[in-house]
Regions:
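Metal-dependent amide/peptide-bond hydrolase catalytic core
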Residues: 68-73, 78, 84-287
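Acidic/histidine-rich catalytic neighborhood of metal-dependent amide-processing enzymes
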Residues: 3-79
Length: 287
């Protein structure tokens, strides 16, 4: 998308191009890494690069991932929530709509299951951590696959998904077990069987320290370019920064965005792109 993540690609590149065009040689080396697969767990992207060429990176590096931000450019992301994507496949018995007693309606069972899981999660895991925006764990039913193509058929299979972004101190295994309990209750009451799969499961690595050199470098550059005080924060979204952090490499996520990623009419503003390039140039120069 134009914001997610072409804006970060272009702004980081043009910050470096400005130095080259002006004949400025920085005091330290600068590297840009462009990786694939970020939306699908980075198995063929940064994860592969870190495994195959981990020698490219050092804990002393200033690692910036331009993949999240705020409209005023003052949010520096230093932490991400744990998370998992859950898939529920509900099996019942298909039949004609005129004789529902001969079938087991998986859509009705799925609706009950979604409501039960949603209510349980959002009333059990209510802690807040003001480092993060939003400050609570989020548990959202999202995708629903098509079942029967016509109105007069009772569906015998339904598939739906949850997207869960969980504050780091919670135990994902415990949450998974409680979800299974809700599944078992609804299955016993409705006669369906349920296959519960993990599409992905990521425990949050340790946050990048607030006083790390990369955070301080961004704070100085943002103050110079925007005359604003930046602040370290956490987000619910996932970026490739977590893979750096898992390797003990302190990374910061930063850009100036209106948070239109994955939305209809996703956009980035040219003034933001130019300002971000200026911030990157200041960081490259060690200012």
């Amino acid at each position: 998308g134009v914001e997610d993540n072409h804006q970060g690609l272009v702004s980081s590149f043009f910050g470096l191009k400005a130095l080259i065009d002006e004949g400025i040689v920085p005091d330290f080396s600068i590297g840009l890494i462009f990786v694939a697969d970020e939306e699908t767990q980075s198995v063929f992207g940064l994860r592969h690069v870190l495994e195959a060429r981990g020698d490219l990176f050092s804990p002393a590096d200033l690692i910036i991932v331009p993949d999240a931000g705020a409209p005023d450019g003052t949010m520096i992301e230093i932490a991400e929530k744990s998370g998992f994507w859950l898939k529920f496949t509900v099996h019942g018995k298909q039949c004609h709509g005129s004789v529902p007693q001969l079938g087991i309606n998986t859509l009705r069972a799925s609706a009950r299951m979604i409501t039960a899981i949603d209510q349980m999660l959002n009333t059990t895991y209510t802690d807040r951590d003001e480092l993060f925006r939003p400050s609570v764990s989020t548990f959202e039913p999202t995708k629903k696959e098509a079942n029967v193509p016509n109105i007069n058929t009772i569906p015998g299979e339904d598939i739906f998904y949850f997207d869960c972004r969980v504050l780091p101190h919670y135990d994902l295994d415990e949450i998974q077990a409680k979800i299974q309990q809700e599944i078992d209750k609804v299955a016993a009451e409705t006669g369906v069987t349920v296959q519960f799969d993990l599409v992905s499961k990521e425990r949050a690595p340790a946050a990048t320290p607030m006083d790390s050199p990369v955070v301080e470098a961004l704070i100085r550059a943002i103050k110079t370019v925007h005359d604003r005080e930046a602040r370290p924060m956490g987000i619910g979204g996932g970026t490739v920064a977590k893979f750096f952090r898992q390797k003990g490499l302190p990374a910061a996520v930063w850009s100036t965005t209106d948070s239109t990623a994955h939305s209809p009419n996703e956009y980035c503003l040219l003034p933001n792109l130019v300002a971000d390039a200026k911030v990157f140039a200041h960081v490259y120069l060690g200012l």
